[in-house]
Curated annotation (Swiss-Prot):
It catalyses: D-fructose 6-phosphate + L-glutamine = D-glucosamine 6-phosphate + L-glutamate. Induction: Constitutively expressed, part of the cdaA-cdaR-glmM-glmS operon. Residues 283-422, 452-590 form the SIS domain. InterPro entries: GATase_2_dom (IPR017932), GFAT (IPR005855), GFAT_N (IPR047084), GlmS/AgaS_SIS (IPR035466), GlmS/FrlB_SIS (IPR035490), Ntn_hydrolases_N (IPR029055), SIS_dom (IPR001347), SIS_dom_sf (IPR046348). One of its GO terms (cellular component) is cytosol. Its main location: cytoplasm. Keywords: Aminotransferase, Cytoplasm, Glutamine amidotransferase, Repeat, Transferase. The active site is at C2, K595. Catalyzes the first step in hexosamine metabolism, converting fructose-6P into glucosamine-6P using glutamine as a nitrogen source. This is Glutamine--fructose-6-phosphate aminotransferase [isomerizing]. GO terms for molecular function: carbohydrate derivative binding; glutamine-fructose-6-phosphate transaminase (isomerizing) activity.
Amino acid sequence: MCGIVGYIGQLDAKEILLKGLEKLEYRGYDSAGIAVANEQGIHVFKEKGRIADLREVVDANVEAKAGIGHTRWATHGEPSYLNAHPHQSALGRFTLVHNGVIENYVQLKQEYLQDVELKSDTDTEVVVQVIEQFVNGGLETEEAFRKTLTLLKGSYAIALFDNDNRETIFVAKNKSPLLVGLGDTFNVVASDAMAMLQVTNEYVELMDKEMVIVTDDQVVIKNLDGDVITRASYIAELDASDIEKGTYPHYMLKETDEQPVVMRKIIQTYQDENGKLSVPGDIAAAVAEADRIYIIGCGTSYHAGLVGKQYIEMWANVPVEVHVASEFSYNMPLLSKKPLFIFLSQSGETADSRAVLVQVKALGHKALTITNVPGSTLSREADYTLLLHAGPEIAVASTKAYTAQIAVLAVLASVAADKNGINIGFDLVKELGIAANAMEALCDQKDEMEMIAREYLTVSRNAFFIGRGLDYFVCVEGALKLKEISYIQAEGFAGGELKHGTIALIEQGTPVFALATQEHVNLSIRGNVKEVAARGANTCIISLKGLDDADDRFVLPEVNPALAPLVSVVPLQLIAYYAALHRGCDVDKPRNLAKSVTVE
């Protein structure tokens, strides 16, 4: 959600900023802008729309060796040129970009900016104007910046230019991700490592309530008291080629195809020298010894948690609750005496989940983060971390992170079961390998998935997904995939709930997708399909081999039914992809959505 890039060095700042912002497009945005500094001053270019639109307005003749850039996802003020970043102070001395939400911007405006006319509706402009007011009152830029930061309530990642000191970028962070990349004759600032890989893979992580003074040959980190902080740098595990589409038309299709490889990598990563599945002993003990586990997630991660709940309860015999992070913060349930909290987040930066983590840590409870990004905020602040090893996921619609979360939760449940002396009844390593092969076979049947999308979703405005047991949890994920990238109103329902209200929405031609992978509910879900078909629905049954009937539209390869969610979701991902494609939608960057939701 939003992105920041900054550069100061010897190269063309404009192009580095624009390329960096392109690497942050996956985070979601509605406008973009850059500010570059040279001997003539600070030049600001911004535009509503895509980075391609911004490129059209950037003056190619302006040469600069330093700059800051931003992609905006509207929180305060509509998407517009005036609300796009960078923002400048009234006298034009300061230029600033900001990610996050300043909760007390109205109070700051009333207290410090009574005589300043604001040009935008944003909370961000208030920050840059307050800085200038403090400088006008006699403070040096660094001190004015620090004083302003101490006043801010909320989340922020900020990069600031001073027109009187154009060889320096002032940076600060609180509850919004920001990294500083290191080079021999340059330094860069970015919301995540993907934006800086074009020039460096070495970076320093910033902690909350820290500020940084960045020049082309120096990075000085300070706390808000002005004390200098020394911190070791990291080498990013990513390679620039990891974040390219290659021959694929869209990242979503590429990432769907990568799922079998991710499954095999998870198997390999979580095997010990004897080929047995393993996680660090303290994590296994935390799961096995908990009297109740609370899985916290948002969107797709929440859906993965629903599947993980079944594994942990069925195999490890530990009760589990799954909660939407944004609701948990305000409606915390009565907690057990020895809980363990598991946080699912692809990015490790989800603000709603982090808010819950802060709450439960304050209560003294243990927390495990399962994430795709090492060193992310949720990873750093939890007691334990398990990594998904899925590689960068760029498309807004999650595919491989979802199946990776399910696989890692399965591994965790299996290890906890073993620690509790429970035999789960099958070889999970072998069955995950079979599931990976099945996923690969499904990825090779794209023509069939495209045909189903054309047949059922070409003119549809609504669609329903029904299932029972584990299939129901996959249905809610399939519905989310369809609605978020094709803009078709789609909902997933438990098959038995149809008669309690939802069936009233069924009319002639309504597409209804049904999953049938669980033997104990196979007859029941087929009965539900007959109910909606009798009312005119256009039904599509996707069944598991061995449970299939002659009239089923598509049959999945045979896998262990417990792991069917890893396999049954792949057709739903591809059907959603082709439905969006045929409707002319932006598959990788759907409207109004952000990949990494870093504000509550």
